[in-house]
């Protein structure tokens, strides 16, 4: 059964690279190309496995990373060293690093502008606030913004678990479930569970086809803002909550 889900509603290849850099706490000025390439290709492979409509830019970036990786493995040529004896480093990562730094700045500015816009909207529309309620309020850390790539990482983890449990010989019963039906099922399941549950609990049925449909249904619900995805810290468990918003 063919499922098509457009990734364009989420992010692009530079976002994926920044996600990996943040997730694995990598120094953006000293990117381990072999590691980042392996992780990047793993994500792209998962997107293609899920039959997501992967933009060509992802594949171009994959080719760029492989090219940089191959250049990093080449021995230094004598002609690359200047005659004056000064150290000269022609780093194949330089252009990519500059693009990432520039894009990171752009993302930060965009986030700040969005926050200011939200603050202005609250200033003119919200009713007076009773500030006494803030006096005894303790500081709490807000959940991380969960992206498509966090969700893909969680799905990869699910598939690794399934692979470890799957016997050598299995009988596959192919079931076709419409994504819209699975979306309804998930919302009903959340309602029964009090509006919030673990992301992994949505995958009680370990049939691969159903797992794929469930994951795509979660992405659609995210895109429609019908559910809220929360994760306290990197690698922590992901929770799904109903936003009580109908479409």
Curated annotation (Swiss-Prot):
Q: What subcellular locations does the record give?
A: Cytoplasm
**Would the keyword Cell division be found if you checked this record's keyword annotation?**
yes
| Superkingdom, natural source | Bacteria
* Name of one Pfam family that matches: SMC_ScpA
What InterPro entries does the annotation carry? ScpA, ScpA-like_C
Keywords for the protein's UniProt record, in alphabetical order:
Cell cycle, Cell division, Chromosome partition, Cytoplasm
Output a single Gene Ontology CC term carried by this record.
cytoplasm
Cystine connections:
none
Q: Which GO terms describe its biological process?
A: cell division; chromosome segregation; DNA replication
Query: Subunit details for this protein?
Result: Component of a cohesin-like complex composed of ScpA, ScpB and the Smc homodimer, in which ScpA and ScpB bind to the head domain of Smc. The presence of the three proteins is required for the association of the complex with DNA.
Its biological purpose is as follows: Participates in chromosomal partition during cell division. May act via the formation of a condensin-like complex containing Smc and ScpB that pull DNA away from mid-cell into both cell halves.
Name the protein family: Belongs to the ScpA family.
Could you identify this protein by its name?
Segregation and condensation protein A
Q: Organism source for this protein?
A: Bacillus mycoides (strain KBAB4) (Bacillus weihenstephanensis)
Q: Which gene encodes it?
A: scpA
């Amino acid at each position: 059964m063919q499922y098509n889900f457009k990734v364009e509603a989420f992010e692009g290849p530079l976002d994926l690279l920044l996600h990996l850099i943040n997730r694995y706490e990598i120094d953006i000025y000293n990117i381990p190309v072999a590691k980042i390439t392996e992780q990047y290709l793993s994500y792209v492979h998962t997107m293609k496995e899920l039959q997501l409509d992967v933009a060509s830019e992802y594949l171009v970036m994959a080719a760029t990373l492989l090219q940089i990786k191959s250049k990093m493995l080449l021995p230094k040529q004598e002609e690359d060293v200047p005659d004056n004896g000064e150290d000269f480093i022609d780093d194949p990562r330089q252009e990519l690093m500059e693009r990432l730094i520039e894009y990171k700045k752009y993302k930060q500015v965009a986030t700040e502008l969005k926050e200011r816009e939200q603050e202005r909207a609250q200033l003119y529309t919200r009713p007076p606030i009773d500030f006494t309620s803030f006096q005894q309020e303790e500081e709490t850390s807000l959940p991380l913004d969960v992206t498509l790539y966090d969700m893909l990482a969680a799905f990869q983890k699910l598939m690794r678990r399934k692979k470890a449990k799957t016997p050598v010989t299995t009988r596959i019963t192919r079931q076709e479930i419409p994504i819209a039906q699975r979306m309804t099922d998930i919302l009903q399941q959340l309602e029964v569970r009090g509006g919030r549950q673990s992301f992994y609990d949505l995958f009680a049925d370990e049939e691969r086809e159903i797992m794929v449909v469930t994951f795509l249904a979660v992405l659609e619900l995210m895109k429609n803002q019908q559910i809220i995805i929360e994760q306290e810290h990197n690698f922590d468990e992901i929770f799904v909550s109903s936003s009580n918003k109908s479409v």
